[in-house]
Curated annotation (Swiss-Prot):
It is a multi-pass membrane protein. Keywords: Cell inner membrane, Cell membrane, Membrane, Transmembrane, Transmembrane helix, Transport. GO terms for cellular component: plasma membrane. This is Putative peptide transport system permease protein BMEII0209. One of its GO terms (molecular function) is dipeptide transmembrane transporter activity. It comes from Brucella melitensis biotype 1 (strain ATCC 23456 / CCUG 17765 / NCTC 10094 / 16M). Pfam families: BPD_transp_1, BPD_transp_1_N. It comes from the Bacteria.
């Protein structure tokens, strides 16, 4: 049963990924500029530019170019970077561990802190703590991440000297150095999602705590801790699980800005540099990879959601 469910969800994701690939290609075609001119240089002759256009297949109709690009994509060929002079897939593979490390560390901070704050806020409804959690949630959607990141660098790196202001240390080189290089950007990245998760957890907990079986458990003399942990939280956790996948996607997307500020050599920084340098194959490949990653995360969350709540059925 579970194998059939997984195969079904993966099969449903394939056309979505195909649409993502086609939209990515078409968006790149809408951008101004000629890749052949970028490769040849401003002083190149028209003959040189035309020769490069033919070599890249840019002289072909858009439909033919799309078909060739999808064929190359099927063979895991994302093209070659103009700026880096290396395959796009290699550039992505080299920088992916940084982005994943940043997102996972931020996720590890967000989930326990956000859930605990949401549970306590629901239990202490209308208290000063509850008000503080709601204020933090509002802060998360109001304050730009780059502004808070710059303040954090000034305070914790420049003034106090607790953390490095930029750079990345691979985990295998130094686990402690890896943690020091990521803890500040990961905390800033997590802060905006902690408020959202806390608000979501609080809402689910309040809804569950108003159910009849919670009142029945309390009337039977069940301890308040057991009511919260065993009955209320376990049932509210199903919805929180769904949100966690969305949060992880947001953390990966938010890493674009954070990586720029903290000079982390991840996918976000690669994408920004490629956009500024008009390195279209890298822009195209990175956007496509991130799109596929988001689809894969959603599929995984759907599967976990069904495992956590067997009542869920897909048509």
């Amino acid at each position: 049963m579970m194998t059939a469910l997984i195969l079904k969800r993966v099969a449903q994701a394939i056309p979505v990924m195909l649409i993502v690939a086609i939209l990515t290609f078409l968006l790149m075609k809408l951008l101004p500029g000629d890749p052949a001119i970028l490769i040849a240089g401003d002083g190149a002759s028209p003959e040189t530019v035309e020769r490069i256009r033919v070599e890249l297949g840019l002289d072909q109709p858009t439909v033919v170019q799309l078909g060739q690009w999808l064929w190359n994509l099927f063979h895991f060929d994302l093209g070659r970077s103009f700026l880096l002079s290396q395959p796009v897939s290699q550039a992505i593979a080299e920088r992916l561990p940084v982005t994943i490390s940043l997102a996972l560390l931020a996720f590890a901070i967000t989930i326990p802190v956000g859930i605990i704050m949401g549970v306590v806020a629901a239990y202490l409804r209308d208290s000063w703590f509850d008000t503080g959690v709601m204020s933090l949630a509002l802060l998360g959607v109001s304050v730009p991440s780059f502004w808070l990141a710059i303040l954090a660098v000034i305070l914790f790196s420049v003034t106090l000297g607790w953390f490095p202001s930029a750079g990345y240390v691979p985990f295998l080189d130094s686990p402690l150095g890896w943690l020091r290089s990521l803890i500040l950007p990961a905390s800033i990245l997590a802060l905006f999602q902690i408020g959202y998760l806390a608000r979501m957890t609080r809402s689910e907990m309040l809804e569950v705590m108003d159910q009849d079986y919670i009142r029945t458990a309390r009337s039977k003399g069940v301890s308040e801790y057991s009511v919260l942990s065993t009955h209320a939280f376990r049932n509210a956790l199903v919805s929180v699980l769904t949100v966690s996948g969305y949060i992880f996607s947001l953390l990966i997307g938010g890493s674009v800005v954070i990586e720029q500020i903290f000079a982390l050599p991840g996918l976000g920084r690669l994408l920004v540099q490629a956009i500024l340098a008009r390195d279209l194959p890298v822009v195209q490949g990175t956007m496509l990879f991130l799109g596929f990653l988001f689809v894969a995360i959603n599929v995984l969350v759907d599967i976990l959601y069904t495992i956590a709540d067997p009542r869920v059925r897909y048509d």
